[in-house]
Amino acid sequence: MSFFKRIFSSEKKETLDKGLEKSKSTFFSKLTKAVAGKSKVDDEVLDNLEEILVSSDVGVNTTLKIITRIEKRVSEDKFLGTDELNQILREEIAALLSEIDSGEATEFVIPINVKPYVLMVVGVNGVGKTTTIGKLAYQFKKAGYNVVLGAADTFRAAAIDQLQIWADRVGVPIVRQNMGSDPASVAFDTLQSAVAQEADIVIIDTAGRLHNKVNLMNELTKVKRVMQKVVVDAPHDVMLVIDGSTGQNAFEQAKQFTAATEVTSLAVTKLDGTAKGGVVIGISDQFNIPVKYIGVGEGIEDLQVFNKYEFVDSFFK
């Protein structure tokens, strides 16, 4: 029986387990070799574990933190065996993630005292940003909220059209303008429309271009400033969407966007079919940003609220 608190439905847990299967099997095949013939956790085992964590895209800095924590546990209990290593690893990684966000993950909910709740979504093209927005709209509508989408990624006609398709599929209103329109103008109109409709949630899609950090910074700053003319404290969340299957490249994306704007949460997509699931742990720790959602499949239901305990349980069990 897991030592973690059970709050997921069995169906969601099964989806999570399946989505992380490749990361888990790759990790454990390496771990099994690392501890072969060993009964105690010694320096060689820890060195091997360090290599495994780095190769799983946990990242060097985060890996060293984890190893230091395990070394402390080993020094406190000289009789710790390799059979207990996995359990210790799970506990320490869960503790590390808890330091970034101590809250318990819940279903798709927003603060009750904020209306409309404004979520601005950033991320490079191709990471699944627009798809994530569509799935979020579906989940929030399913939870009983009135959702409005804003197509402020105006530099790609495909982005506007894709968001329109999601709006039609989910059955939520969308505010859009022509390709090349001012993104801030779209965001402004979206918030005005949301206020008029007494919407609960506004999700704003933004341009995913990284070729010029200064332009990106200026654009996102302007979008924020203009939104605040309608909703004073908007946006309430700036969520960076990253592709979990890209491994170390995801770290670079996070570095670029956190330099351009304040990022308050992460959504990690495409974790199914990749062995790079450790990126969830590394990016959250390195940038001190909580993971809110993870994508573990292509289905509309396969965007899940991130629960650190269930994630660690699925990854390391």
Model-derived segments and spans:
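Short beta-alpha junctions and helix-cap segments that line functional grooves
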Residues: 3, 106-107, 136, 252-253, ...
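Short, aromatic- and cysteine-enriched interfacial helices/patches
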Residues: 3-10, 28, 35-36
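Switch/coupling subdomain of P-loop NTPase systems
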Residues: 4, 10-16, 21
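Primarily NTPase-proximal linker/entry elements flanking Walker-type ATP/GTP-binding cores
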Residues: 17-152, 159-179, 187-195, 199-204
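Short hydrophobic/aromatic residue motifs in ordered secondary structure
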Residues: 60-62, 156, 272, 300
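Residue-level signal for short, function-critical loop segments
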Residues: 153-154, 244
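Conserved catalytic-core segment of NTP-binding enzymes
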Residues: 162, 182-197, 211-317
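Short glycine-rich anion-binding loops that position phosphate/pyrophosphate groups of nucleotides
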Residues: 207-209
